[in-house]
Curated annotation (Swiss-Prot):
Organism ancestry: Eukaryota, Viridiplantae, Streptophyta, Embryophyta, Tracheophyta
SUPFAM superfamilies: BEACH domain, Concanavalin A-like lectins/glucanases, PH domain-like
Pfam families to which the protein is assigned, alphabetical: Beach, DUF4704, PH_BEACH
Coiled-coil intervals, chain numbering: none
Domain remarks: The BEACH-type PH domain (1556-1653) is required for interaction with GFS12.
Region: Disordered, residue numbers: 1481-1513, 1829-1923
Chain intervals with Polar residues compositional bias: 1829-1848, 1856-1871, 1898-1920
Disruption of the gene: reported phenotype: No visible phenotype.
InterPro entries: BEACH_dom, BEACH_dom_sf, BEACH_Domain, ConA-like_dom_sf, NBEA/BDCP_DUF4704, PH-BEACH_dom, PH-like_dom_sf
Species of provenance: Arabidopsis thaliana
Function: May act as a negative factor in protein storage vacuole (PSV) trafficking regulation and plant effector triggered immunity (ETI). Negatively regulated upon interaction with GSF12, and also probably by BCHB. Required for ETI, but not for cell death.
Domain BEACH-type PH: 1544-1653
Protein name according to UniProt: BEACH domain-containing protein C1
Compositionally biased spans, kind Basic and acidic residues: 1496-1510
Acidic residues biased stretches: 1481-1492
Length: 1941
């Protein structure tokens, strides 16, 4: 079937030599005047059987010579002149009677064309193509003749072979004018015309020839190509063969026929003769040309011998290719003829024939007939069945071998599919059934499956269209999931375990890799239009597939598509990924990895076989056959290639790696970016309003959500998700590394932190990761940050710096809580973190204002320790304890750096000075050069001084906390922003504490202690009375400056903290003459002694002061700053010393010559000297170089080897007293000026306080060395500044004694230091340095120091929602902006409240109440109060001072405005007063009084005006204290029995969640916070939304402020719906206020309710902890109590409304009461008549009227809409409009109703005005099915019900009037046997009971006004209505309610 003969036409003419040929008719004229064309298909058996070698050589030479033009045209014909030597089989001959014409013949495999004209001349042309025998050729000859204008012609001869133009040669066309007499094809000319070869033997043709086309003119290359392409089997569609091709049944043949018909239409005019073999009949073949079919006079060709047509391809008609398939099947089932395997040898034999048979079929189907037959007989399905049988049978019989290892079968199948060229649909079907169906091949060996997939990869380049049409991507993905699984699924086929063997995981993964390569090639070869669909398939696959190996590889495939070199395609795939839901898919994958990663091991187990292989077995069947596996391993087919594939086992983190790589690629390519700006902290504003405020799109939100989900996934499962591979990938994506497979090359300088979003995820995840990973990450990031300044800058400029690294440090310390020792590696990690921070901050130390970075680092640590995190208990304590430890080590490291750097800068500046001096510059230029060189030193010194102040801040704070450590914290609250210095402001002495310590502690924190009784007794006269002058002095002494205001100016830390407080109180009173000792008693100092001092210090494990290493480092830094190597003082050029080489640095001099830096350095030096003196040898400087090992870190020493070396160098300098002299040198050397008085006065006060506390109370020097060090400079200052200080008269005591005026031994030149110190211990000296001038100067300096320590806190910013790891507090935001802020104290806060405003507040209210009834008789407005009674009645109205008549809503608004403008009323003054009171009134909220017991409606004073508000605001108004803390924190009184355990007082945050407070007039968004003691609602000011700027007339302040409720105030909880979602809770308090909160979803509501219940509110009854209405109703026995008449009808209905979810707070679901009565027409209403009651069994209300109900049913049945479902009622029985219809007359519903009606009341039906008419409308109107809604059923009891004038709808109507039914006017209601209406919950039926009581009748009136007259409104508002008795309420409550409306 694959022979050469089969490639030609199916039918052909056979020429068998001289006895055969075609003889054609002649023509009366020469038909080829313009040229000719000849075309045919020919198969030549032999060219020259007798041709010798010489003849062949001559022919080849002749052809070559003819091509080169070196031989004449006649030469080829004269090659041989011998007789019978030339064999030239003719192709055709066209001759005239005189032998003129054209001939073509073969000469030794070359085609020769000869032409002859008159006079015997002839020419010939040899073509160079060598034809081969026994091969089919399409030969076309075309001779053109183009006649010129002048008779010249341009002729050429063309040769076509197989449709292509092979050769074109110039050849003159003969001019022939004679008729055509002889036409011969394949035979000799007749004897009468021997032709052009007369001298040679006539040679016939031995060949087969297809159809013969003779054209009478050239047809051109294009037509010749089409003629060759359609083949020789096509019969033209004209002549006798017309219509035959249309018998085709497949598309291919039909398309070919259509194309052929078009070609025939073009060729029909050119053709001269056409004879087709299929038309042969006997010895004659008719002419099939157009002229022959038309009946032209032509004689058909006749054969000179028997000629017959042959058909070589007999398959389409005799056996078909499918007949070979039975040879591949050994046996079949007899019942269904399905193949089966019974005999192994026969099966193997038939299998060996499979590949050759498939190849034979591939050749056979090339023929159109076979192709059509294969389609008709469903060949692809049959082939697939046979192939599956072959593979399964062989696999079942060949277990011990490599299953199916014959790759020839794969090649045969591939050849079969590729051989199909003419029928594309059949090819697609073959691909689907044979190649793409992995089920057939799944039983094969790994090698054979890989061969198949590799073949498919190669076929993508040639068969992409067929594979695309076969939907190869989806088919392969489905097969991948079903057959290449690692986790068993329901739909997966376990074909790998037919023999019980296990699969190799590596082989499965390798096959998946090969399969995805096919998909990648298909996607790359497709047009961009297919990208979206292909990616959608991939995304759907990874969403649904639980196979982690497949998901990871598909993600890697997407990554390769996005980062491919072709930028256009990469862009297309990236955009398609995003638009096809790629971001959402990644979100799902992240969530799945968090939830299911730990469950993967439950589905399969990995078993090591022989120590090297990993296989997969189903759970519960892990047993492996050792023999089978041994055979598999030792099999010959198991090559090293298989072994390498088995090592292709995934890590468990490959999915996360794929996600991160894909996200990183999309970010790096610019596809995932924010349009709202480059913010690194994208997660902090994720769920907030940042995106909306900054114009963010939904795409920005999705990108941020993706990054947020990735972060939360790492935090939720760090050990499983944050692995080494994931970390490397994430860090590589952050720096945009090209590849991270082999790790990151940190030496590559091209790495930059280009993607801060990904870096932020990594940094925020590190606190949750393992310590090993933390160490690695810190080292890597530090290395990257240090390799380039840009990296360091980008890292430090992140908003999260340094929060993430501090959180690592603090969280690790927190995790070690409760452990005996630190975790392994904690010390190393802590060292690494501190080194990281110090290296980063060292760079800031060299920059201007670099101290801001240090300050921000410390503030961040403070925020993290006290606010950050969510830990409680011991872990929270550990977290707070880490702050001082961190500060010590950080500040100590920076001080070490500063000391060493200052030394280095000294040498730099000195070298620069020497260089400028050597250049002989002018002094001015040299000075400028030195200052420029010293600029870095200026920045360094500035930052160093700030560090010193931070150290002092730390020491002062720790001292205060240590002093208060033994006290009890009464009520700490997380809502307080005050951390330093009043962290524990409320202190009480603990049990067992000494009175001395207790009093000292109390004196530190407060100055409220009075004068001792002994002092008062000493100041009394003989009669025991205290004179007025003495009392004035006592009062003045009590008003002296408290210690808190001056403490920061002293050295108020260390061992003398308590002594300083006591001394100041005592000495400040001495100046007023209070507490003067008697003359006989000894006047001593303030030192409390060594025991007290040691007790005041916080000790480490070795018993040393824990702050001592930090003090030592501060001293070392000051020595490097102020002293030179010789130890001489006078740094900065002061005092003659060179200092650190800073001569000429005026900037540094001015820097340090300011109050705050100077005094800070002085206090630190004094501290070091004081703590050095322990009554023995010096402790501070003795072992400075070797005693640096005191614990200063969390788990490791504070110092390191570098600091020890620095300390060793600095210890060579002189004693610390030299440092004190250097610090005080500016004061000693500066000119005496009054401008420096404050600094000098503060310096002397500080020095004297140290002298005072170094002397004991019995006047003994306790610290002699300290006194010897500080007295000389102290005395020197006093001597120098004595003239100025003596001029301060206020320094004198009450007796007029100024110690600086008189001569004293203390200032004597020969006085020893101890002697001088003891001389200063006197009342005069003590009082002088605590006098008012001294106190004022100290207070100003202390304000500056305290301002640095504890700046004023602004209002806390709104917290970012949905961030559980943060609280409502944000970091300390007030920072010093410039260094100059140290040089002046902070300004005191302004108190805008006048001094007497507190007293005037109440007076304004009372005077307003008195004046108002006299001056404002009109325009009184009211609004409904939210206070409820015990039965939930809202029966109180309160004045609405900001109310309005809403005149703008009326039609005659212009006229009323004119009248109002011309109305003279003396109310202007009152309006001003009311405006002032308005603020006071509206400051109050809904929770008026926190009464828990009693009726809130009953008040003692009936004339007392109720003002809405809260006690917090009342206290604020009356006291003028601007404290934003809740009332519970300011003035909370607790029962002493409740304070049982101090740990219970520790308040912590339990839950924070975004929520919305729903109010009738507005919706306020904020954060709902639950702590262990409170429920807080913090308003988000930016999100605050109100329905109107004026709620009921004004903007209510209580809607905007934060709220806080104690847990003890909670009484009930109910679940609610809001906006048709079950997402809300309503809280009912013990004070009968209620609040409605919406949490957005059911989960949020559930979490909030659970958190509240778990907090165990004491007054929350157990029955209300369950929020299901049925449970609450059953537990409370609501219906039973109503049936027993224990509760009224109203209370029962309100309880039902409450349980049903109706609330006063939501206007869309307001409480409703049903209509009860149905008779509103009768004059007398008989309550005993059942017909007067509504039938409550017919619900809803639309079913009451049968006629209307029938209309509703007809409407329902006839309604047809494709979108809207059928419905009965077009409105709801209780909507917002229906509620406001009834309640529009009372605020705040008036305002709401106006807003709903578009601010116009212009229709009469907009407001409820007639009871009877309303009932009629409810009963008959098709659009009215309203039930009754009410503000409160007992509102009729309040006389002033509504506003005087609301609006007017009609000129003659009054909207304040409501018409009542006529039976309401009767004087008597006979109720002898009347029955009261009661409701039963079960069937809503009415039951009656006898009533024997009489009821007073109402006053008759036709219409009853619901509002009182304007004249007596105020009087009636204070009148309490008469209440009915209990029995009367039970009987007629419902009726009274209906009648009152």
């Amino acid at each position: 079937m694959n022979g050469k003969e089969s490639r030609g036409p199916a039918c052909s003419f056979e020429f068998v030599g001289e006895s055969s040929g075609l003889l054609g008719p002649g023509e009366s004229r020469w038909p080829f005047t313009n040229g000719y064309a000849f075309a045919t298909w020919i198969y030549i058996e032999s060219f020259a059987d007798t041709l010798d070698a010489s003849t062949a050589a001559a022919a080849i030479a002749a052809a070559s010579a003819a091509k080169s033009g070196k031989i004449s045209n006649a030469a080829p014909a004269n090659v041989h002149t011998g007789e019978g030597t030339a064999h030239m089989p003719r192709l055709f001959s066209f001759l005239t009677p005189d032998n003129q014409g054209i001939e073509a013949y073969f000469y030794a495999q070359f085609l020769v064309v000869e032409s002859g004209s008159g006079k015997g001349s002839k020419t010939s042309l040899h073509f160079t193509h060598a034809f081969k025998p026994q091969c089919w050729y399409f030969i076309g000859l075309e001779h053109t003749c183009n006649q010129g204008l002048l008779g010249n012609s341009d002729s050429e001869l063309r040769l076509y072979i197989d449709g292509s133009l092979y050769e074109t040669r110039p050849f003159d066309y003969p001019r022939i004018s004679k008729p055509l007499s002889f036409c011969c094809i394949g035979s000799n000319p007749p004897s009468t015309t021997a032709g052009l070869q007369r001298r040679r033997r006539q040679c016939a043709l031995f060949a087969e020839m297809g159809p013969v086309y003779i054209f009478k003119e050239p047809i051109g290359p294009e037509r010749m190509t089409r003629l060759a392409t359609r083949g020789g089997d096509v019969l033209p569609c004209f002549g006798n063969g017309a219509g035959l091709p249309w018998l085709a049944t497949n598309d291919h043949v039909r398309n070919v026929a259509e194309e052929s018909s078009l070609s025939d239409a073009e060729l029909g005019g050119y053709i001269h003769l056409l004879y087709h073999p299929c038309l042969l009949s006997g010895r004659f073949c008719p002419d099939a040309s157009l002229s022959g079919a038309a009946g032209d006079e032509k004689t058909p060709y006749s054969f000179s011998a028997v000629v017959f047509a042959l058909c070589y391809l007999v398959f389409p008609y005799f056996g078909r290719p499918m007949s070979l398939l039975p040879l591949t099947v050994s046996s079949v089932h007899k019942d269904n003829l399905e193949p089966c395997s019974r005999n192994v040898p026969s099966s193997l034999t038939t299998y060996s024939l499979a590949a050759p048979i498939f190849r034979m079929i591939s050749f056979a189907i090339k023929h159109p007939g076979n192709n059509e037959e294969l389609s008709r007989t469903r060949g692809p399905e049959i082939l697939a069945t046979v192939l599956g049988y072959l593979l399964h049978s062989l696999a079942s019989f060949d277990i011990k071998h490599d299953r199916v290892g014959d790759e020839e079968l794969v090649a045969a199948i591939v050849s079969l599919c590729q051989s199909q060229k003419i029928n594309h649909a059949l090819k697609v079907q073959l691909f689907c059934t044979l190649l793409l169906d992995l089920k057939i091949w799944s039983v094969c060996s790994y090698r054979l499956q890989k061969k198949l997939l590799s073949s498919l990869q190669d076929m993508v380049f040639t068969e992409a269209t067929a594979m695309r049409n076969a939907d190869a991507i989806q088919v392969l993905l489905d097969g991948c999931r079903r057959y290449f699984w690692t986790i068993q699924e329901k739909d997966s086929v376990n074909t790998f375990s037919l023999d019980g063997d296990a699969r190799q995981v590596g082989e499965v993964n390798a096959l998946v890799d090969e399969l995805l390569v096919i998909i990648e090639l298909l996607m790359g070869a497709a047009s961009p239009s297919f990208a979206a669909d292909d990616l959608h398939r991939l995304l759907g696959f990874i969403i649904e597939s639980p196979q982690p190996n497949q998901v990871a590889r598909v993600l890697h495939l997407m990554f390769r598509l996005v980062v491919q070199p072709n930028a256009a395609k990469a862009q297309t795939f990236a955009e398609a990924f995003i638009t096809s839901g790629g971001i959402e898919t990644l979100l799902v994958l992240i969530a799945n990895r968090v939830n299911t990663m730990g469950l993967e091991t439950e589905s399969f187990q990995q078993v090591k076989v022989h120590g090297s292989e990993t296989v997969i077995c189903e759970t519960g069947s892990v047993t492996l056959s050792s023999s089978v596996n041994a055979d598999r391993i030792s099999s010959v087919s198991e090559t090293p290639f298989n072994n390498n594939a088995r090592n292709n086992v995934d890590d468990r983190d490959r999915v996360m790696v794929g996600i991160i790589r894909l996200i990183g690629a999309l970010i790096s390519k610019g596809h995932l970016k924010f349009s709202v700006g480059a913010k690194s902290d994208v997660m902090s504003n994720l769920m907030g309003s940042e995106f909306r405020e900054n114009g963010g799109t939904m795409f920005d939100y999705k990108v941020a959500l993706l990054l947020f989900a990735l972060l939360k996934a790492f935090q939720a499962a760090p050990n499983r998700l944050m692995t080494d591979n994931v970390y490397t990938t994430l860090l590589g994506a952050s720096v945009n590394a090209s590849s991270t497979e082999d790790g990151l090359n940190f030496c590559d300088l091209g790495h930059r932190f280009e993607h801060p979003q990904l870096l932020l995820i990594l940094l925020r995840s590190l606190p949750f990761a393992s310590k090993a990973l933390q160490n690695r990450a810190l080292q890597d990031i530090l290395f990257l940050a240090c390799t380039h300044p840009e990296k360091r800058s980008s890292l430090t400029k992140m908003e999260e710096w340094p929060e993430w690294i501090l959180e690592i440090l603090i969280s690790n310390y927190e995790k070690d809580a409760g452990k005996q020792s630190a975790s392994p590696g904690s010390a190393e990690e802590e060292d690494l973190i501190h080194n990281f921070l110090i290296i980063m901050l060292e760079h800031s130390m060299r920059q201007k204002d670099g101290w801001k970075d240090i300050e921000a680092t410390i503030h961040c640590a403070e925020w993290l320790t006290f606010v950050g995190g969510s830990s409680t208990g011991e872990k929270r304590i550990r977290r707070e304890e880490s702050l001082p430890i961190f500060k010590r080590r950080l500040l100590g490291g920076l001080l070490d750096f500063a000391a060493s750097e200052l030394q280095a800068q000294t040498q730099v500046i000195a070298a620069a000075s020497a260089g400028f001096a050597a250049e002989s510059l002018t002094p001015k230029d040299a000075k400028a050069g030195v200052e420029n060189a010293a600029l870095l030193s200026v920045f360094l010194v500035e930052n160093t001084v700030v560090i010193l102040m931070l150290v002092e801040d730390h020491l002062r704070l720790q001292s205060k906390q240590n002093c208060a450590a033994s006290a009890v914290d009464v009520s700490p609250s997380p809502l307080s922003l005050v951390y330093p210095p009043n962290y524990r402001s409320h202190t009480l002495p603990t049990v067992g504490e000494s009175s001395e310590v207790s009093s000292s502690c109390a004196s530190v924190s407060s100055d409220s202690g009075g004068v001792h009784l002994d002092i008062l007794a000493s100041m009394a006269d003989a009669s025991g009375q205290i004179s007025t002058a003495v009392m004035e002095r006592l009062a003045a002494a009590a008003a002296a400056e408290p210690y808190e205001s001056v403490s920061c100016a002293f050295v108020s830390y260390g061992s003398c903290t308590r002594d300083l407080a006591d001394a100041w109180k005592y000495r400040s009173r001495l100046w007023y003459g209070v507490g003067l000792p008697s003359k006989t008693s000894c006047f001593g100092g303030g030192g409390s002694g060594w025991d007290s001092w040691k007790h005041a210090l916080q000790k480490d494990a070795q018993g040393n002061w824990i702050e001592l290493p930090l003090v030592k480092k501060s001293v070392s830094m000051l020595q490097a700053l102020l002293l030179d190597e010789s130890g001489l003082g006078g740094g900065l050029g002061i005092g003659g010393g060179s200092g650190t080489g800073m001569g000429g640095m005026s900037g540094l001099y001015q820097l340090l010559d300011s109050d705050q830096p100077f005094l800070c350095m002085l206090r630190m030096v004094l501290l070091s000297l004081r703590e050095e003196d322990h009554g023995e040898d010096s402790l501070l400087m003795k072992n400075l170089s070797s005693e640096d090992g005191i614990t200063g870190g969390l788990q490791c020493p504070l110092g390191n080897s570098a600091s020890v070396d620095i300390s060793s160098q600095l210890s060579m300098r002189q004693s610390p007293s030299a440092l004190l002299w250097s610090v005080l040198s500016p004061v000693l050397n500066m000119p005496i000026s009054d401008s420096k008085r404050q600094r000098v006065l503060v310096t002397t006060c500080v020095l004297y306080s140290e002298v005072w506390n170094a002397v004991s109370k019995d006047k003994r020097p306790l610290r002699k060395q300290y006194l010897e060090a500080i007295l000389p400079p102290f005395v020197a200052i006093l001597r120098r500044w004595r003239p100025l200080l003596a001029g301060i008269h206020e320094l004198s005591t009450g007796d007029g004694v100024n110690p600086l005026v008189v001569d004293t031994r203390a200032l004597a030149a020969d006085a020893l230091p101890i002697e001088a110190a003891l001389s200063m211990i006197s009342p005069e000296w003590a009082a002088a340095f605590a006098s008012p001038p001294s106190a004022m100067a100290l207070a100003m300096i202390a304000a500056g120091a305290a301002g640095w320590e504890a700046p004023a806190h602004p209002a806390p910013p709104a917290p970012p929602p949905l961030r559980r790891d943060s609280s409502l507090l944000e970091r300390k935001s007030t920072k010093l902006q410039t260094f100059s802020s140290f040089q002046k104290p902070l300004e005191a806060p302004n108190d805008d409240t006048p001094g007497r405003a507190r007293d005037k507040a109440a007076a304004n209210i009372d005077s307003h109440l008195l004046i108002q009834p006299l001056t404002r008789l009109t325009g009184v407005f009211w609004k409904l109060d939210s206070m409820e009674s015990s039965s939930r009645m809202r029966q109180c109205l309160r004045r609405n001072y900001s109310g309005t008549g809403h005149l703008e809503t009326t039609r005659n608004y212009g006229d009323q405005t004119y009248l109002m403008n011309n109305h003279d009323s003396p109310v202007l003054a009152v309006e001003a007063i009311s405006k002032e009171i308005m603020y006071e009134d509206d400051e109050h909220g809904d929770a008026d009084d926190l009464e828990i017991e009693g009726n809130v409606g009953e008040r003692k004073g009936e004339n007392e005006e109720r003002r809405s508000g809260s006690l917090e605001d009342a206290i604020t108004l009356s006291t003028g204290i601007n404290d934003h803390r809740p009332l519970s924190e300011q003035n909370m009184v607790q029962n002493s029995t409740e304070v049982k355990d101090l740990s219970e007082l520790k308040e912590r945050i339990v839950l924070e969640i975004s929520s919305t407070m729903v109010r009738p007039l507005g919706v306020v968004k904020g954060t709902f916070q639950i702590t262990t003691r409170r429920i807080n609602f913090i308003v988000d000011i930016r999100e605050d939304q109100h329905l109107d700027e004026k709620s009921d007339g004004s903007k209510s302040r209580d809607e905007e402020r934060d709220r806080s409720w104690l847990m003890s105030s909670l009484h009930q909880i109910y679940s609610r719906r809001y906006l048709l979602k079950k997402s809300a809770l309503e809280l009912f308090m013990v004070d009968r206020s209620n609040f409605f909160f919406d949490f957005g979803n059911t989960e949020g509501r559930r979490n909030a309710c659970r958190a509240i219940v778990q907090a165990r509110p004491p007054h929350l009854k157990n029955i209300y902890s369950a929020t299901q209405p049925e449970q609450v109703s059953r537990r409370t026995q609501l219906m039973e109590r109503w049936a027993r008449w224990e509760i009224s009808n109203f209370e029962y209905l309100m309880q039902l409304n409450t349980l049903a979810g109706r609330s006063y707070n939501d206007i869309t679901q307001y409480p409703i009461f049903p209509w009860i009565l149905c008779d509103y027409v009768s004059e007398i209403l008989d309550l005993s008549n059942p017909s007067n009651y509504r039938d409550l069994s017919k619900v809803p209300i639309g079913a009451l009227n049968p006629e209307r109900l029938k209309k509703f049913q007809e409407k329902h049945s006839s309604f047809e809409d494709p979108v809207i479902p059928k419905f009965h009622y077009g409105s709801h029985y209780s909507s917002a409009g229906a509620v406001l219809h009834y309640l529009a007359r009372v605020e705040p519903f008036t305002t709401l109703s106006i807003q709903l009606q578009g601010r116009k009341f212009d229709r009469a039906d907009q407001i409820f005005s007639d009871i009877a008419a309303t009932w009629k409308g409810v009963l008959q109107d098709m659009n009215n099915v309203k039930e009754l809604n009410t503000t409160d059923p007992n509102t009729h009891m309040v006389s002033s019900f509504s506003n005087p004038t609301t609006s007017e709808t009609e000129p003659d109507s009054d909207m304040n009037i409501v018409s009542t039914p006529s039976n309401a006017t009767t004087n008597q209601i006979d109720t002898e046997s009347s029955e009261a209406a009661n409701y039963e919950n079960s069937n809503s039926s009415i039951k009656t009971s006898k009533n024997t009581s009489k009821i007073t009748k109402l006053t008759p009136t036709s219409k009853r006004s619901l509002t009182s007259s304007k004249d007596n409104a105020a009087q009636k508002s204070s009148t309490k209505p008469k209440l009915l008795s209990k029995a009367e309420i039970i009987k007629v409550d419902v009726y009274s309610y209906i009648m009152s409306l």
